[in-house]
Regions:
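Beta-loop-alpha module in the N-terminal Rossmann-like domain of NAD(P)-dependent dehydrogenases
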Residues: 48-112
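Predominantly a Rossmann-like dinucleotide-binding segment in NAD(P)-dependent oxidoreductases
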Residues: 126-225, 350
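N-terminal Rossmann-like dinucleotide-binding module
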Residues: 1-48
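Active-site loop of classical SDR/Rossmann-like NAD(P)-dependent oxidoreductases
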Residues: 12, 36-39, 302-314
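Hydrophobic residues in well-ordered beta-strands that form the structural core
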Residues: 55, 95, 120-122, 246, ...
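Rossmann-fold dehydrogenase core element
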Residues: 108-126, 145-150
Length: 370
């Protein structure tokens, strides 16, 4: 049984991580919960029989009995400092995205992890969902030939419009977050996970709606000043005549477009926008050599948990206890971080930006439901 600690007991903890731990409760449990707001930490601790709530980080890190894994679920600008402090205390960390704010910060974290011999596990977990495990394996087997391009779109209006959002929506519209770091990151991990490291990017975009009004009942009517770009259109060159395009936005009231489409020289794969968050969900496949010449829905063997966030918890368990190769690596997360930061620079300068980091592409992990 993995003994987990949770730092940050806000919306993402309550909405996904805690239900995910409960769903996998025969293999993992929460023993310690930290938040600067005592009520939040206590609410999480009360969900587990032997958990303790903390508002002191020192006390949390000194939790009696220790912890096998600590989830860093704090706001994005805090990730680097929290992860470093937890690792320096000797613990293994699973951090929400992004790994840090800069590539240099991410490299510093990887150095600490290497000294501890405990690699950082980095969200998002898109590539370890059943769908994308299957897709990676399908492409590696030549199922539709050589991948040529990916077109991805992800967005909405951001958390200010989520009536049931539990946290503070303002941070998502400020420097250090925005749509690319909040949700575009999911598709960037898919694009690089399937096509490999990017070599160059060019982006256009900006602040299209400079003031937001919240729809969250407890904050209804409050105004948010947007200080970071809320729309990105990014072209990505992966080399070897392979390309990608990502549209990432907090200025998209709705859309009927697919969330993700991959084109290869003998076929295509499409994922509906209403399907993408279900990691066990179907993908539509088109093959040029299919006599019917039509789309076919393919559903992979399901994993015990299907959510994109929750799938990462399962992968962490299987990595720590079963020796499953780590797919959610710090190298891959750092590469995606550089792409996101390069997109911001490209908006400012109008230039194409060379990407300097890389990562070793991980082989597909077989889909297994046990």
């Amino acid at each position: 049984m993995i003994r987990a600690g949770v730092i940050g007991c806000g919306d993402v903890a309550r909405r996904a991580y805690i239900p995910g731990v409960q769903e996998l409760g025969d293999r993992i449990t929460v023993v310690a919960a930290f938040d600067t707001i005592e009520e939040r930490a206590q609410d999480i601790a009360d969900m587990f029989p032997d958990a303790t709530a903390y508002t002191s980080m020192d006390a949390f890190l000194a939790h009696e009995g220790g912890m096998d894994l600590v989830f860093n679920l704090t706001p994005a600008p805090l990730h680097r400092d929290i992860t470093a402090r937890v690792m320096e205390a000797g613990y293994r960390v699973y951090t929400e995205k992004p790994i840090a704010s800069t590539v240099d910060e991410a490299r510093e974290l990887m150095e600490i992890a290497a000294r501890n011999d405990k690699p950082i596990i980095c969200a998002p977990a898109t590539m370890v969902t059943a769908r994308f495990r299957w897709m990676q394996d399908f492409l590696a087997s030549g199922g539709i030939g050589r991948p040529i391009a990916i077109k991805a779109q992800i967005g909405g209006m951001g958390p200010a419009q989520w009536a049931e959002y539990f946290g503070d929506p303002r941070v998502f519209y400020q420097k250090g977050v925005g749509p690319l770091i909040d949700t575009g990151v999911y598709m960037l991990h898919v694009m690089t996970g399937l096509l490999g490291p990017a070599r160059r990017i060019h982006a256009v975009g900006g602040i299209t709606i400079p003031e937001r009004e919240t729809s969250i009942p407890r904050l209804k009517g409050e105004k948010i000043q947007v200080t970071t770009p809320d729309m990105f259109s990014i072209n990505i060159d992966f080399g070897n005549e392979t390309y990608g395009h990502l549209f990432s936005s907090f200025a998209m009231p709705n859309s009927k477009a697919p969330m993700f489409e991959l084109f290869a020289d003998r076929g295509a794969i499409s994922v509906d926008r209403m399907q993408w968050y279900n990691g066990n969900g179907a993908s539509d496949v088109f093959r040029l050599d299919d006599p019917a010449a039509d789309w076919v829905s393919v559903t992979p063997p399901p994993l015990p948990t299907g959510g994109i966030l929750e799938s990462g918890i399962l992968h962490a368990i299987q990595h720590i206890e079963d020796g499953e190769p780590l797919a959610l690596t710090a190298d891959a997360a750092t590469h995606v971080l550089e792409i996101m930061n390069a997109a911001h620079r490209s908006l400012e300068t109008g230039d194409a930006i060379e990407i300097t980091t890389t990562f070793d592409a991980q082989p597909a992990i077989p889909v297994a439901s046990d």
